[in-house]
């Protein structure tokens, strides 16, 4: 009975189908769906393409712009913020939003208008048929948005005089009901008249006359 030969010193071959070439090893997990040799730039990512990137899956994955996160060596050699376009954490600063593990998150479509700074917002609205002012409800071209905001917010609210209607005066354009004798009305500087309760409600969302919004 001969002794069983030892296999301790025998070189172990590669497993079938497994490459030992280091170049075939994929990048670390935090690179997600990015190609290591390419430049992403600013681009929209679908819901499926941002899975596994640190987003809370219990919430709706938002629309946003994403940039690839740099490697550990890039972050180590990035300095302490000497380059104003970079923060040393692997993504390029473009303004607005907040950053979440290798991407620039600017919020959902519904809230994008509220989160974008003014130097980025015109790009968004120019691609979406202008901008509707929340103060006066007028449609404004994106390149006039900042000026319009300043004028609209600094414009004083219209005043009016209370009065009691002495005779029927047609239709109130706010509630579309008749202005009848004895109704309490509001007379604006432009001489338009409305039910007092109607114009009070109107002024909560708009500072201009319903029939003369440009005044």
From Swiss-Prot:
Metabolic or biological pathway, per its Swiss-Prot or TrEMBL entry: Protein modification; protein ubiquitination
Keywords per UniProt: Endosome, Lipoprotein, Lysosome, Membrane, Metal-binding, Myristate, Transferase, Ubl conjugation pathway, Zinc, Zinc-finger
Subcellular location field: Endosome; Lysosome; Membrane
Chain residue ranges for the region called Disordered: 1-39, 66-96
GO BP term (any one): protein K48-linked ubiquitination
The protein's enzyme class: transferase
CDD domains named among the record's database cross-references: mRING-CH-C4HC2H_ZNRF2
GO molecular function, one term: zinc ion binding
Assigned EC number: 2.3.2.27
Domain of life: Eukaryota
Membrane protein topology class: Peripheral membrane protein
A single cellular component GO annotation: lysosome
Family matches, as PROSITE patterns: ZF_RING_2
Keyword Cell inner membrane assigned: no
Zinc finger (RING-type): 172-213
Lipidation (N-myristoyl glycine): 2
A Pfam family of this chain: zf-RING_2
General function of this protein: E3 ubiquitin-protein ligase that plays a role in neuron cells differentiation. Plays a role in the establishment and maintenance of neuronal transmission and plasticity.
PANTHER family per record: E3 UBIQUITIN-PROTEIN LIGASE ZNRF1, E3 UBIQUITIN-PROTEIN LIGASE ZNRF1-LIKE PROTEIN
Protein name, per record: E3 ubiquitin-protein ligase znrf1
Source species of the chain: Danio rerio (Zebrafish)
């Amino acid at each position: 009975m001969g002794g069983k030969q030892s296999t301790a010193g025998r070189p172990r071959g590669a497993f079938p189908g497994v490459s030992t070439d280091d170049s075939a090893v994929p990048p670390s997990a935090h690179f997600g769906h990015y190609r290591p040799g390419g430049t992403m730039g600013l681009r929209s990512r679908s819901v499926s393409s941002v899975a596994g990137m640190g987003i809370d899956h219990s919430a709706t994955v938002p629309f946003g712009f994403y940039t690839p996160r740099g490697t550990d060596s890039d972050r180590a050699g990035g300095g302490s913020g000497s380059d104003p376009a970079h923060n040393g954490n692997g993504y390029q600063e473009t303004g607005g939003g907040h950053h979440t593990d290798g991407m620039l998150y600017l919020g959902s479509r519904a809230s994008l208008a509220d989160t974008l700074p003014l130097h980025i917002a015109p790009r968004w609205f120019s691609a979406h048929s202008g901008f509707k002012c929340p103060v006066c409800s007028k449609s404004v071209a994106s390149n006039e948005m900042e000026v319009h905001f300043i004028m609209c917010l600094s414009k004083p609210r219209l005043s009016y005089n209370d009065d009691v209607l002495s005779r029927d005066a047609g239709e109130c354009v706010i509630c579309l009901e008749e202005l009848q004798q004895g109704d309490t009305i509001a007379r604006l500087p432009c001489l338009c008249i409305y039910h007092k309760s109607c114009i009070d409600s109107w002024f909560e969302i708009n500072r201009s006359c319903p029939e003369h919004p440009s005044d």
